[in-house]
Amino acid sequence: VINAAVVIQKGKILGVVPKTYLPNYKEFYEQRWFTSALQVSENSVRLCGQIVPMGNNLLFETAETTFGIEICEDLWATVPPSSSLALQGAEIIFNLSADDEGIGKHNYLCSLISQQSARCISGYVFSSSGFGESTTDVVFAGNGLIYENGYLLARSERFCLEEQLIINEIDVECIRAERRVNTTFAANKANCPGKEAIRISTEFVNSKDLNLTRTFNPHPFVPQGSELNSRC
């Protein structure tokens, strides 16, 4: 049994990404139930009548961008799977999580995502369990977070008792430009951890009704608010 994310488009399953690092400490005991991706020898699985690729090294390519997936605790690893995925072309990382709450943990989580998106020079979309999913053992705040290269773009309301959806735009062209000029990122490709990525091509159609919501500071080098005291 694996803990996995499934990518589906128009009724077709494109791939299955199993969780790599299973926490088995404190309130977590996932190794009792699940098998790590590191112990899965198969690279495909039959699911809903379809035989589809399976692995923690899947990259999903569209005409516009390439994305990869990791699951919850994977982000907490010393070398997260997303590091390898980013070095092999993933520009956006999605993390499906059941991250419970603890005192001070939210700030630590935000710091982790910020740092990982900065190290990978990527977008990072984090979605955790929330409304209606807390139990007598753990509490979920429903964290929804979108980061780009270390910067927060959008966040959901915590502990909301209704369903939520956050939307923002990740500047993929900016990510590509940053990677081109970052010689350390280029050099790291030669020492890329993890398995070679399996690339899955998929169609992507832009919505004609899409309205951009992201705004940009017209004076990025002029500090505002509390930054004024620290920088000037």
Q: Which residue stretches match the model-derived regions?
A:
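Enzyme catalytic cores with a strong preference for nitrogen-chemistry domains
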Residues: 1-232
